[in-house]
């Protein structure tokens, strides 16, 4: 066991062990493509490819380093080999468009099987074709703009309560753990209707273990992160199965309504063709949404606070906008769904934060036919990877890309080149919860500036770490808070 533990510390040895058979097979398969013009690049060693360099880059404060080094050497399309798969990385808006606009024509979604075991193979990300349409339609019943209006007040009051109870009254706070607690509290209430803090805490802890395991070496051996994640996923499934059955009984008894939360919506969903969801699909999509809403919302909220701490003039403009909205209200009247449209500058600040610090790195696809692009052939069966970093942080698409400039998103980003700004993905696979995330982020910003007149990072130069993705402050972003009188 000590030797195995050493492997977890030495990923270079471990990846050689894990990828040896797949690497040999893929090496000889690649010989069959010698007659076609493949993109430039390096497949690395037959056994491990360039997996080590890729993983090392993702775990750093600059996850884009792997991509940028090869872009400068090979251009906007290059080949590599990642986790045993020959992969073509497509950069720039043209490459993004190819990958994101050709679902089921040229490409299909493709995630590592080890990750799908933790998220759930019957979730939206694991579906294609008609099955993808059915599951997406079910989720839209809850996550679409029309449905979100029904949950606006509940989300707003939950965020306000969290800030009042866990932020206000403090001179200092560490942002990341508080944001994680807030995001999970909102998700558990709106997804499951869970209000018991002990159950929220149990689910929260399980999810943390699963998230760490999702980005670890996939060894299902006691003591390893992936094994712990598999066990946590099984426990999570048991709890969620119980919640599903309990809610089904409540719906039958008339003590729960069809639209009170996501669980009820999915249990009662039937589309125009009579399709509904099996319990396994409901369970796996809950798991996916917990991952998505938790991990990809933690980053925007945390980095939003980091950015505003460095730009007090933007914080003041956000506060002025929010208090301007409140000035139109009667005494004691809370903000409403329609007020989100008036948060124009606040949303520009959020958009610029998402541009500079994308909540997702990118996603993989698999070529379902030979693809001809820019004079090269991408063979059927190869993986394709698009990334947010190939455009969102590039000077050629965003002038002064390293500077925080919310004004670039004035007029709803009409001056932004298509397929250069993709913080939630795009095409058929755009994140189904992006409107949910937008509402949550703007409500958090609203209640935060109401409570605090300003903030200051205790360490403005705090480093970021991508373990796991996306990169976040290594110490959780300690800040000083200045309460409003």
UniProtKB/Swiss-Prot annotation:
GO MF assignments: heme binding; iron ion binding; taxane 13-alpha-hydroxylase activity
Protein residues bound to heme: 431
PROSITE patterns reported for this sequence: CYTOCHROME_P450
Listed GO biological process terms: paclitaxel biosynthetic process; sterol metabolic process
Keyword terms: Heme, Iron, Metal-binding, Monooxygenase, Oxidoreductase, Taxol biosynthesis
Pathway it works in: Alkaloid biosynthesis; taxol biosynthesis
Catalytic activity: taxa-4(20),11-dien-5alpha-ol + reduced [NADPH--hemoprotein reductase] + O2 = taxa-4(20),11-dien-5alpha,13alpha-diol + oxidized [NADPH--hemoprotein reductase] + H2O + H(+)
EC number: 1.14.14.106
Family, similarity comment: Belongs to the cytochrome P450 family.
Official protein name in the record: Taxane 13-alpha-hydroxylase
Organism (species): Taxus cuspidata (Japanese yew)
High-level lineage: Eukaryota, Viridiplantae, Streptophyta, Embryophyta, Tracheophyta
């Amino acid at each position: 066991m000590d030797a195995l533990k050493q492997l977890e510390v030495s990923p270079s040895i471990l990846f050689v062990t894990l990828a040896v058979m797949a690497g040999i097979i893929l090496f000889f398969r690649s010989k069959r493509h010698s007659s076609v013009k493949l993109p430039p690049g390096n497949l690395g060693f037959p056994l491990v490819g360039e997996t080590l360099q890729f993983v090392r880059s993702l775990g750093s404060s600059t996850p884009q380093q792997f991509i940028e080094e090869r872009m400068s050497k090979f251009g906007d399309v290059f080949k590599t080999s990642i986790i045993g798969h020959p992969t073509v990385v497509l950069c720039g808006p043209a490459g993004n468009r190819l990958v994101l606009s050709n679902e089921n024509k040229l490409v299909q979604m493709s995630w590592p099987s080890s990750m799908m075991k933790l998220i759930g193979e019957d979730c939206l990300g694991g579906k294609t074709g008609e099955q993808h349409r059915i599951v997406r339609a079910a989720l839209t019943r809850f996550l679409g703009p029309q449905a979100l209006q029904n949950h606006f007040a509940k989300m707003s009051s939950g965020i306000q309560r969290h800030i009042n109870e866990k932020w206000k009254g403090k001179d200092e706070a560490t942002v990341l753990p508080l944001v994680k607690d807030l995001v999970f509290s909102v998700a558990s209430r709106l997804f499951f209707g869970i209000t018991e803090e002990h159950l929220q805490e149990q689910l929260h802890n399980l999810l943390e273990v699963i998230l760490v395991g999702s980005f670890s070496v996939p060894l299902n051996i006691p003591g390893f992160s992936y094994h712990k994640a598999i066990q946590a996923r099984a426990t999570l499934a048991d709890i969620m199965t119980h919640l599903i059955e309990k809610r089904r009984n409540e719906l039958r008894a008339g003590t729960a309504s069809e639209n009170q939360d996501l669980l009820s919506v999915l249990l009662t969903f039937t589309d125009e063709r009579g399709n509904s969801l099996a319990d396994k699909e409901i369970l796996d999509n809950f798991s996916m949404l917990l991952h998505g809403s938790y991990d990809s919302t933690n980053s925007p909220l945390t980095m939003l606070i980091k950015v505003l701490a460095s730009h007090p003039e933007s914080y003041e403009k956000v506060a002025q906008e929010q208090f301007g909205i409140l000035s139109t209200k009667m005494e004691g009247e809370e903000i409403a769904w329609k007020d989100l449209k008036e948060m124009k500058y606040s949303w520009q600040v959020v958009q610029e934060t998402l541009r500079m610090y994308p909540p997702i790195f990118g996603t993989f696809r698999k070529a379902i036919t030979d693809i001809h692009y820019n004079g090269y052939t991408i063979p059927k069966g190869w993986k394709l990877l698009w990334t947010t970093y190939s455009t969102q942080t590039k000077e050629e698409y965003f002038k002064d890309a390293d500077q925080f400039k919310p004004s670039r998103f004035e007029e709803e980003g009409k001056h932004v080149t298509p397929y250069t700004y993709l913080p939630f993905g795009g095409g058929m696979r755009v994140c189904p919860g992006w409107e949910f995330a937008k509402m949550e982020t703007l409500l958090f910003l609203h209640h935060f500036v109401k409570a605090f007149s300003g903030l200051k990072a205790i360490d403005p130069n705090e480093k970021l770490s991508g373990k796991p993705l996306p990169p976040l402050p290594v110490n959780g972003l300690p800040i000083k808070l200045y309460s409003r009188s």
